[in-house]
Structure formats: structure tokens, C-alpha cells
Regions:
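Residues forming the flavin
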Residues: 1-335
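N- or domain-start disorder-to-order transition segments that initiate the globular core
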Residues: 331-367
Length: 367
């Protein structure tokens, strides 16, 4: 998302091309990306066999894949509890079901090539080949940040939420709060109606102000008030790192030790730490790592997460191929308010960038 709701959309698996880049100017933009499950930091968390609860559930329910034989589940929310039920239905033995709310924890994973043993927070060591993590979600606020919003951390929900959005950008779904399916659908419908109302008003103004103005169809639509019922913020424990160090950015090989070292060397702001360690600068662009990185820095500086802030996201939101960017450049043709007069007096057009300007009047040879 760029200035004034100029949006770049990637369309894949199209009949004429594997990828198509669509450029659009949106009168209203609705952002509803849902939530991304967040990893947990502990020693050995990059060992094969350590999986997020959502990934485990998809393997079982969508692909009929049994992800392991003996599992340790660390849960802080219903997603982790649902993973336990799915694992048991798939014939996986649950050797330890750990409740974050009760202070239970995973400290370390041991094994050569895959998970073999798991050290728990109470000192016990259990034999397992699967560790399932269900410790929270990250709200992907990147597109909102590109619209000028700086998300604010809510410690009670352990998530970032939007702070201030322009009128032409609206958010709905999990990125704004929690709720039942019916509540989320109702909020989405109300958001769509509000976005459509604002888009109609923008279209009316554009038709009135256009160089080749034409009478708009009827009066300017009335402005709908934002009467949406805010979605609730369900309490969630702040669980980002165990008592041990582990990987924060799996794609850039950045560990929590690296972040602590960066703070010791003076790179103690979230922006400086990012550039010094390259955390969040890999293919995922911070979708999995941003919150954990901020949590490690807050702990190292003995500060609240809300005071650490966030980095500034820049387009693109997701990686794109150079092939999708190749091709002819299509730009809008822009005309001044005098263009009709120029044409009526025999002006020959001259393309000056996007603008159509008069080059000369009449026939130069005849003159």
C-alpha cells in the first residue's frame, strides 16, 4: 500500500500468466489479514520436530499426516488445546500437556537431526519426537503501518493493535480483536458497508473535480457513521521466551543472544537492533519475528513492551518475483482542466510524463 491508497496486488495462477501485477487506486481499503501464529523462544526451538499448533492441526486434518508418535504440547490458548485433541485422534501419545497459565514451560530440546528429548520447566526430561507450540498470535499490521498507523501494544492481550487509521483504510477480523464466528462476520459486514459508503463519496468527488467533468449521478451520498461494535480483546499471557535462549529469526539465523549482544553494544532501539542483527529482514519480513524481537529487547532493557515500539514496514508486504515486475509500464493519462479548450482550438497533444499538454496549434507547415 502506497500513498493515497495506491495498491499493488499480485494475482497468481492466472490463465495468461503465472503472476500478474495489478496496480489500483482504491477509494477505500479494507485490511483483514487475520492472525499469524507466533513461535516461542527456547533452546533448540529450530530443531526438526518443533512445530506450531496450527501447522500440526493442518497436517492432521487436511493431509492425514501423523506428525509424530510422542508429543509435548505447550499451550496458552484454545488453539493449543485443540491441537491436543487432534493429536490424540491421530494416535499420537501426549507425554506432557503444559499450561502456560499455570507457569509450566519448555526449557530445551535435545536431539540429533530431530527432537528426541524435551527438558521441561520443572526440571523433568521426557522422551518425545514432537513439540507443539501454541503460545500466541501476531497481528500482521504491516499494511496498516504503510497507511501511516503505528501499532500500540496491549499487554493484556499480548498483541499489537492499530492506533490511528486514515478514513480510507479500515480493518476488521482478528487484527482488531477476538470474537465468535458470528461476531467476526457481523463486524466484517459492517466494515464492508462503511468502506462502500466512503468509496461512493470519493467517487462522487472525483467526478465533480475531473478535468472532463460530468454531472454525477445524484447528490453526494451521505456519510455513514462508524457504529461498529468493537471486537473484544481476550486476555492472553505474555509468553515470548523461556528461561533459555533460542532462535528468533529462523530465516536470518538470528538468536535471542544476538539481540542481547546488540543491546550491550549500544544498538538498543528496535530500529538499530534490526539493522545491526538483520532480524526481521528475511523473506518473512518480520511476520514471525517482530513481536519476539521486541520482547527480547524489552527484557534486555528492563522496559515494558509498549515502550519499545515497532519498526516501520515498507512495501512489498510479501516477496514478489522480478518476472512479475517486468513488462510495459501502464500509467494513467492526466489532463488539465483546459484540455477541452486546447483540443477545440486545434492543439496538437504532447505527452509530458503522464500529462497531456498542447504542443502547438494549427499546422506548422501551413504557418
Amino acid at each position: 500500500r502506497y500513498d493515497h491508497n495506491w495498491i499493488a496486488v499480485m494475482q497468481r495462477s492466472h490463465e495468461i500468466a503465472p503472476e500478474r501485477l495489478i496496480k489500483a487506486r482504491a477509494a477505500s481499503l479494507v485490511v483483514a489479514p487475520g492472525l499469524i501464529e507466533r513461535p516461542y523462544i527456547f533452546a533448540g526451538n529450530d530443531t526438526p520436530g518443533v512445530m506450531l499448533s496450527g501447522a500440526v492441526r493442518r497436517l492432521i486434518n487436511l493431509w492425514a499426516v501423523k506428525p509424530g508418535t510422542k508429543a509435548v504440547v505447550l499451550s496458552a490458548n484454545p488453539e493449543g488445546e485443540a491441537a491436543i485433541a487432534d493429536l490424540e485422534s491421530a494416535g499420537v501419545k501426549i507425554v506432557a500437556a503444559l499450561d502456560v497459565w499455570a507457569g509450566e514451560d519448555v526449557v530445551e530440546v535435545e536431539g540429533k537431526g530431530r527432537v528426541e528429548k524435551v527438558i521441561l520447566g520443572d526440571g523433568r526430561t521426557v522422551s518425545a519426537d514432537l513439540v507443539v507450540i501454541g503460545t500466541g498470535w501476531t497481528a500482521p499490521t504491516s499494511l496498516l503501518n504503510m497507511a501511516g498507523d503505528r501499532p500500540v501494544y496491549d499487554p493484556s492481550a499480548a498483541r499489537y493493535f492499530s492506533n490511528h487509521l486514515p478514513d480510507n483504510v479500515l480493518a476488521t477480523g482478528g487484527i482488531t480483536g477476538n470474537g465468535t464466528t458470528a461476531e467476526l462476520v457481523a463486524h466484517g459486514r459492517a466494515t464492508g458497508s462503511l468502506a462502500a459508503s466512503r468509496a461512493l463519496r470519493v467517487r462522487h468527488d472525483r467526478r465533480v473535480l475531473a478535468a472532463r467533468a460530468r454531472n454525477p449521478e445524484g447528490p453526494k451520498p451521505e456519510s455513514l457513521q462508524d457504529t461498529r461494535t468493537p471486537l473484544a480483546r481476550v486476555p492472553h499471557p505474555e509468553c515470548y521466551r523461556s528461561s533459555t535462549h533460542g532462535m528468533v529469526d529462523l530465516s536470518e539465523d538470528v538468536s535471542s543472544k544476538d539481540l542481547v549482544q546488540a543491546k550491550k553494544e549500544g544498538f538498543d532501539s528496535i530500529e538499530l537492533m534490526k539493522r545491526y542483527t538483520t532480524v526481521t529482514m528475511g523473506p518473512s519480513q518480520g511476520k514471525l519475528e517482530t513481536v519476539n524481537a521486541a520482547a527480547v529487547l524489552a527484557e534486555a532493557r528492563d522496559m515494558d513492551m509498549a515502550d519499545i515500539g515497532t519498526t516501520v514496514w515498507r512495501p512489498p508486504y510479501a516477496p514478489i518475483s522480478l518476472g512479475a515486475l517486468a513488462g510495459r509500464i501502464f500509467e494513467p493519462i492526466r489532463r488539465s482542466a483546459l484540455q477541452d479548450w486546447h483540443e477545440a482550438h486545434g492543439a496538437s497533444p504532447l505527452l509530458a510524463g503522464q500529462w497531456v499538454r498542447p504542443d502547438h496549434y494549427g499546422d506548422p507547415v501551413g504557418e
